[in-house]
Amino acid sequence: MAAAKIKKGDTVLVVRGKEKGKQGKVLKVYERVKRRDKQGNPVYVRHFVIVEGVRLIKKHVKPIEGVREGGIIETEGPIDISNVMLICPNCNKPTRVGFRIVEEGNVRRKYRYCKKCNENIDLVSEKVIKGG
């Protein structure tokens, strides 16, 4: 599975759509399979994010005795991952994200980095290379 360019906890800017220009923290990242082949394998997958305070939708919920009251609740709706841009924690600008692999001795580390300021954002993975 490929590493995600946007993760839970990142601050993002909405760059397209009705909510354009709004910022928020990513609460959840998930994928939705849109189409499968004859064997049942996913062919077309879209990735979505839930951003705090952005794309608020109203849901009508039934009451559940002892759990919740019924009525209309307001919750965040999904936004396609292509419509948001990460805000770099170093330079505080919306940026594209790249991946950088750094080898130090027998350890290979993969970092997400900001393409504007060229600084590492965080560590994605770390592997120990077997000596040869």
From Swiss-Prot:
One of its GO terms (biological process) is translation. GO terms for molecular function: rRNA binding; structural constituent of ribosome. GO terms for cellular component: cytosolic large ribosomal subunit. Keywords: Ribonucleoprotein, Ribosomal protein, RNA-binding, rRNA-binding. Belongs to the universal ribosomal protein uL24 family. One of two assembly initiator proteins, it binds directly to the 5'-end of the 23S rRNA, where it nucleates assembly of the 50S subunit. One of the proteins that surrounds the polypeptide exit tunnel on the outside of the subunit. Part of the 50S ribosomal subunit. This is Large ribosomal subunit protein uL24. It comes from Aquifex aeolicus (strain VF5).
